[in-house]
């Protein structure tokens, strides 16, 4: 404890130019990490595309096989019988495939290297924090990364395939054939992946607000019904097929985030009336 306090004290005595030099070295390390990862992913990109990014185009993708095993009737469970066909992508612009390989390498380097980037930044600011602040920041770092990757996993294995199948097979008229471009596919893929990664950061945000006393458990007890309704609406918008089964499997993880967030808020009295969590629950 004394060593950590002395480290914090000594960091406060560092000159401005020394801090600037440390920041420069930190940014240089971050750039090296991202460049190395980007080059590695650029080399491996053909395999990553075939076995990861384009996997939802295949009829053998796990969620399609699950619905096929259940036997969708189109009413309660989506009918994905047409999913026996692979979704074909086309490229209509010269150089698009090369640019897609380069941009995807950069995006993947950011996603995979994000924990390393945060860790290097953490090493830079750590000497200026108190021990209690360090422990809180360390928990937030680990928890935030886990939730971000969990959100992307849910989007990849569940949300994106359902949206892809629906939009790829939807027809305004039989005279209009769907021809999906590579750009359109990649834009939708990254949008959904990153969106759900950020959505799953909600528990971390709630935890931080709870630590600062901005939000309490009474809030979750009071607005639980509103949360259920809002999550159902969001799940209905995300689930284009509209069947109850797809709606439920999208609704379940989203609503679980709400309840999980409530558990992260510290117990105690409310700011506005001093009511305890038990009295708020009794009112609900």
Feature annotation, model-predicted:
Residues 1-284:
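Membrane topogenic/interface segments and analogous intrinsically disordered interaction regions
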């Amino acid at each position: 404890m004394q060593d950590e306090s002395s480290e914090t004290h000594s960091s406060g005595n560092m000159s401005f130019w020394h801090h600037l030099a440390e920041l420069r070295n930190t940014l240089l390390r971050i750039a090296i990490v991202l460049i190395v990862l980007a080059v590695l992913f650029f080399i491996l990109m053909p395999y990553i595309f075939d076995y990861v990014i384009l996997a939802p185009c295949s009829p053998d993708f796990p969620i399609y096989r699950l619905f096929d095993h259940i036997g969708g009737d189109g009413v309660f469970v989506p009918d994905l019988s047409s999913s026996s066909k692979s979704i074909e992508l086309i490229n209509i612009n010269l150089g698009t495939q090369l640019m897609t390989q380069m941009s995807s390498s950069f995006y993947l380097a950011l996603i995979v290297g994000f924990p390393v980037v945060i860790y290097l930044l953490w090493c830079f600011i750590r000497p200026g924090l108190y021990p209690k602040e360090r422990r809180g920041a360390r928990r937030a770092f680990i928890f935030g990364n886990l939730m971000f990757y969990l959100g992307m996993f849910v989007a990849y294995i569940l949300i994106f395939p359902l949206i892809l199948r629906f939009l790829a097979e939807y027809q305004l008229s039989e005279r209009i054939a769907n021809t999906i471009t590579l750009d359109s596919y990649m834009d939708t893929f990254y949008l959904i992946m990153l969106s759900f990664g950020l959505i799953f950061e909600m528990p971390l945000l709630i935890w931080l607000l709870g630590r600062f006393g901005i939000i309490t458990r009474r809030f979750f007890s009071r607005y639980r019904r509103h949360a259920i309704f809002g999550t159902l609406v969001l799940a209905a918008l995300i689930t284009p097929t509209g069947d109850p089964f797809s709606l439920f499997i999208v609704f379940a993880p989203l609503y679980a985030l709400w309840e999980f967030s409530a558990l992260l808020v510290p117990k105690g009295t409310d700011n506005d009336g001093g009511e305890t969590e038990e009295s708020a629950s009794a009112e609900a």
